[in-house]
């Protein structure tokens, strides 16, 4: 049986923390789909198309990784692409309560889909897209926290 994992998020922008999780997860799943969400509840810095393009560039050398933009209910998207696993990252204990609630709701909506949690490597645990956006907006150097193509896109956005 082939296992397809789906790693959802807004990835606004995709960070080294995201990439670390993607790189490690790609070793365990036959197919890993990075599901870039068009979240109407959040105001994104980058358009959905740009976020998908950046994630594709960052993961270009990973043959079993696909990047797909989506809108709507996550479990519907997972079913659409024949996904088996929802992959979620936990940076800190504070993430757990929300993620546990989400996993429980997703299990209720799609009992055939399992949720798996991964923690980041220690050097990435403090990185978040919102902090990267804030540092960049204030003129700070984010090159340590994002892939060079993402840093370039952030710099261009601030001009």
Curated annotation (Swiss-Prot):
Gene Ontology terms describing biological process: coenzyme A biosynthetic process
Enzyme Commission (EC) number: 2.7.7.3
Transferase as UniProt keyword: yes
Pathway: Cofactor biosynthesis; coenzyme A biosynthesis; CoA from (R)-pantothenate: step 4/5
InterPro entries hit by this protein: Cyt_trans-like, PPAT, Rossmann-like_a/b/a_fold
Broad class of where this protein is predominantly found: cytoplasm
Residue ranges that the Swiss-Prot or TrEMBL entry lists as coiled coil: none
GO CC field: cytoplasm
One of the record's GO molecular function terms: pantetheine-phosphate adenylyltransferase activity
Catalysed reaction, written as an equation: (R)-4'-phosphopantetheine + ATP + H(+) = 3'-dephospho-CoA + diphosphate
Cellular localization per UniProt: Cytoplasm
Binding site for substrate: 10, 42, 74, 88
Annotated site residues (Transition state stabilizer) in this chain: 18
Keyword field: ATP-binding, Coenzyme A biosynthesis, Cytoplasm, Magnesium, Nucleotide-binding, Nucleotidyltransferase, Transferase
Cofactor names: Mg(2+)
Family: Belongs to the bacterial CoaD family.
Biological role stated in the UniProt entry: Reversibly transfers an adenylyl group from ATP to 4'-phosphopantetheine, yielding dephospho-CoA (dPCoA) and pyrophosphate.
HAMAP family: PPAT_bact (MF_00151)
Subunit structure: Homohexamer.
Name this protein carries in UniProt: Phosphopantetheine adenylyltransferase
């Amino acid at each position: 049986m082939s296992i397809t994992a789906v790693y959802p998020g807004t990835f606004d922008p995709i960070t080294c923390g995201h990439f670390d999780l993607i790189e490690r997860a790609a070793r365990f799943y036959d197919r890993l789909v990075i599901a870039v969400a068009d979240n109407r509840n959040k105001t994104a810095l980058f358009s959905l198309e740009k976020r998908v393009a950046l994630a594709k560039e960052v993961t270009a050398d990973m043959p079993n990784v696909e990047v797909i933009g989506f809108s709507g209910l996550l479990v519907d998207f997972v079913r659409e692409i024949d996904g088996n696993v929802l992959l979620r990252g936990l940076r800190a204990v504070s993430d757990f309560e929300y993620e546990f609630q989400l996993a429980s709701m997703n299990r209720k909506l799609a009992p055939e889909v399992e949720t798996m949690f991964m923690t980041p490597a220690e050097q990435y645990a403090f990185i978040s897209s919102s902090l990267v956006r804030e540092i960049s907006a204030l003129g700070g150097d984010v090159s340590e926290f994002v892939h060079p193509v993402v840093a370039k896109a952030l710099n261009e956005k601030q001009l």
